[in-house]
Amino acid sequence: MAIPSFVDRATLTAVAGKGGHGCASVKREKFKPLGGPDGGNGGHGGSVILRVDPQVTTLVDYHWQSTRKATNGESGRGDNQAGANGSDMILAVPEGTVVSDADTGELLGDLVGVGAELVVAAGGRGGLGNAALANSARKAPGFALLGEAGEERKILLELKVVADIGLVGFPSAGKSSLIAAISRAKPKIADYPFTTLVPNLGVVVAGETTYTVADVPGLIPGASVGKGLGFDFLRHIERCRAIVHVIDCATYEPGRDPVSDLDVIEGELIAHGGLEDRPRLVVLNKVDVPDAADLADIIFDDVAERGWPVSRVSTKSGEGLNSLKFAMAELVEKARDNEPEPEPERIVIRPEPKNERQAFSIKRQGDGEGGFLWRVTGDKPTRWVAQTDFNNPEAVGYLSDRLNRLGVEEELLAMGAIAGDAVAVGGEDAVIFDFAPQIESGAELLSRRGEDQRLKSERPSATRRREMDREYHRAREEYGQVGRDLRGESWRARVAEEEWFEGRD
């Protein structure tokens, strides 16, 4: 199977790194019995970033390796040591790459300009350690927040060639020969249609003007509706400042002539849309052929009446090539002068709304089993649930405090929720709770440092945990001894049975 050297469309799965977990640790130092919390924050996960690289001209790398992952952030450690951030995955793409969401079709970005960047998957934020969670009411939290998952997104990359001039025309009109004659480009040239299947770029110097020319693959009638890969070919013209029609004056196909070819291609450009205002130039090619030269003379005035410059050239003999280069340079200079200057990007600061209830919404839904539940959605509640370690009762109490401060409990009561109702926080993978309203805030209760009396914690002490470990290992040893005894009895029974059979023989 041949490996394509030019790929202008690829689907990429970008997976950002996870954030590291925060650390729950208490400083232990001689003569400092109350050293306080010293758990560090987790590191942020790495992001997946697209960056325009002038050395890259194709998307072939993502055609073969379609999944790219950034590294995860490290978890925090004691002694206030924060975890290291994950490394960003920088992916080089050619200039003119259009990025869209493969599932929704949403346009994410249009990368034009060397060094332009776009974050396609943001890394997860690291969880806070208990040192960052401490306050006057919770002096030594016995928990930390978990790191958030990184974004995972499937994106579609489409390359639209960035060039000053696009050469358009029927297959075998001589576009590849023309770009090879006026630049150092070396396209594939052969005597059959659709020799060129991917755009070829060439740099042309005419006096003090330097510009790029794109040899767009041949167009046919119906290209604007997708016939003959028309969609793939036409999109490469969208960024060109000017369009040059290359007309074959030596065609011998029945039903074709230079003027009708020009009308057909121009009609396809108009039907594609967005190209009406681009300046045009018409090249009457292959005038080295006697009959073609006569035909070019006949139609020259008819084509010129359209208001476009017309050039007679021959890529074989070199006739008219030098004047054509300067004519295209003049076209490019005018197009550049008419381009509006890019306005500086305005930075708009939008403060968050003061009414925090806008940060979530609550709906009553069926649970699929004949009952119902209350579903709480919103960025903050969903993120807070993902950060919570549900194996730690104190962390669950902290989550309850945050939801109450946000107004979730008050809103549930206003909508008619009662104690014991099922409450789901998040989307389809939500965590479901039993609603327990009117719980006092942990700050209003007298307790030892870091404790939350709303929850009857069954967490054993350090001494009890050591005793449980010893009991566990003792039980495993007894279990192992029973197994060994059973295997010994089985072996002795088998030996006795064999001896009995031997005695009978």
UniProtKB/Swiss-Prot annotation:
Intracellular or extracellular location(s): Cytoplasm
Binding locations of Mg(2+): S176, T196
Required cofactor(s): Mg(2+)
One Pfam family this sequence matches: DUF1967
GO molecular function, one term: magnesium ion binding
Matches recorded under InterPro entries: G_OBG (IPR031167), GTP-bd (IPR006073), GTP-bd_Obg/CgtA (IPR014100), GTP-bd_prot_GTP1/OBG_C_sf (IPR036346), GTP1-OBG_CS (IPR006074), GTP1_OBG_dom (IPR006169), GTP1_OBG_dom_sf (IPR036726), OBG_GTPase (IPR045086)
Region described as Disordered: spans on this chain: 29-48, 447-472
Binding site for GTP: 169-176, 194-198, 215-218, 285-288, 314-316
OBG-type G domain segment(s): 163-333
UniProt keyword terms in alphabetical order: Cytoplasm, GTP-binding, Hydrolase, Magnesium, Metal-binding, Nucleotide-binding
Residue ranges with Gly residues bias: 36-46
Cellular compartments per GO CC: cytoplasm
The OCT domain, residue ranges: 352-437
Known role: An essential GTPase which binds GTP, GDP and possibly (p)ppGpp with moderate affinity, with high nucleotide exchange rates and a fairly low GTP hydrolysis rate. Plays a role in control of the cell cycle, stress response, ribosome biogenesis and in those bacteria that undergo differentiation, in morphogenesis control.
Record family assignment: Belongs to the TRAFAC class OBG-HflX-like GTPase superfamily. OBG GTPase family.
Assembly notes: Monomer.
Name the UniProt record assigns to this protein: GTPase Obg
Lineage: Bacteria, Bacillati, Actinomycetota, Actinomycetes, Propionibacteriales
